[in-house]
Amino acid sequence: MCDVVYFSTQSGNTRRFVEKLDVPAQRIPRSRNDAPLRVTRPYVLILPTYGDGDPRTAVPGPVIRFLNDPRNRALIQGVVAGGNTNFGAAFGLAGRVVAHKCEVPLLHRFELMGTPEDVAKVRACLAMEMTDVG
């Protein structure tokens, strides 16, 4: 199974979704004062969407900092995005932005804490990504 790296806000929706996956996961620190996370294996990034539909503010700052490290960026295999369908076309926008910029697939979008079906789909994606990367 592919590694999981995730970012979660204080609301904790993304963290709760990742916990339901029941896989080892590393969390991107929220604070600049925390030691930065550096990955050494291919991973799938799971993140929430910020903002009000503006692609410039959809990706959380800590995720941008994490991906600005070329070592971290080189190992990303795909993206899973959380969001809220109340935001219409902006639902999961952060995932689309990161997938486009990193040239990796957007594997799935889930609402709030996700459903059992979302969990099953993401588990399948993680297993597939691990097969693809070796």
From Swiss-Prot:
One of its GO terms (molecular function) is FMN binding. One of its GO terms (biological process) is protein modification process. InterPro entries: Flavoprotein-like_sf (IPR029039), RNR_Ib_NrdI_bac (IPR020852), RNR_NrdI (IPR004465). Probably involved in ribonucleotide reductase function. Belongs to the NrdI family. This is Protein NrdI. The lineage of its organism: Bacteria, Pseudomonadati, Pseudomonadota, Gammaproteobacteria, Oceanospirillales.
